[in-house]
Amino acid sequence: MKIAVVGAGKWGMALAHAYSQKNEVVISSRGKRDLPNFVSLQEALSCEYIVMAVPTQFVREFMSEHFKFNGQKILVAAKGVEVSSGKFLNSVYEDFLPRENVAFLSGPSFAAEVIKSLPTALVVSSHNKELAKSFAQAMPNFIKAYTDSDVVGAEVSGAYKNIIAIAAGVCDGLELGNNARAALISRGLVEMTRFGREFGAKRDTFISLGGAGDLFLTASSNLSRNYRVGYGLAKGKSLKTILQELGEVAEGVPTTSAVLQIAIKKDIYLPIAKEVGLLLEGKDPKSSLNDLLS
């Protein structure tokens, strides 16, 4: 099958590499025109199957400007919550096409390892079982792809784990040890589950690949951009400097703001997210972690 990958960041390119093992893949990006198999946005968005690797906060603007629905089927590869509306990413896409035409990709995965064809397990979630199966079966042999129908659980897990990863990065940057990081991640899983259950997510999703699996990976490795945000803050760098050094979006930063807005409206107890929000606003990292772990 022919698949268009829209968005040529590290994750978009990794997925293009993965899907190209068994399929015809074309790539489109507003900023990179010298890529192999590059096509215009118009051509990419007219393909039946599209992998969307556009950063969360730019999706609405991008879709409004470039997308016209004509039966396309989309696999959402980004993770996060839209700050302006408080909507999860699949809900944003559902403003532009039917939910039966949208699937969501989750699971413990770093672009740097997928691009090397290292063994990986992912989950494709959709309200449309056949759509999830189509995107999953098109994956290469080095990726074990599962399917699921709990889109909300996948979305919450994919977004929330980035918040916990920031906190874990601070923990390691302060050299508080493995015990402290394990406690923080475990409590983060409970907090993530509590948040997701408010939206009808299934509890089992949070102990699956897309939940605990992705959380443990993202919150324990410097390959994670969000982990590096927290680590940098612990080492005394400003958030602005850290984001400039990363050169790519760290979705946990805007997601923290969006989640806290939702928590206020729904009165949800989210102590780790609250502390991460204060950290991003300039609170001393040592004081913040002390408040969380004492």
Give the residues covered by each predicted segment.
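A general structural signal for well-ordered alpha-helical segments in protein cores
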Residues: 12, 59, 86-90, 132, ...
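Internal alpha-helical scaffold of NAD(P)-dependent oxidoreductase catalytic cores
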Residues: 47, 58, 65, 92-102, ...
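NAD(P)+-binding Rossmann beta1-loop-alpha1 motif at the extreme N-terminus of oxidoreductases
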Residues: 1-41, 45-49
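Glycine-rich beta-alpha junction loops
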Residues: 79-81, 106-110, 128, 149-152, ...
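Glycine-rich, N-terminal phosphate-binding loop of Rossmann-like dinucleotide-binding domains
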Residues: 8, 53-55, 220
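Rossmann-like NAD(P)(H) cofactor-binding subdomain of soluble oxidoreductases
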Residues: 12-16, 39-118, 132-136
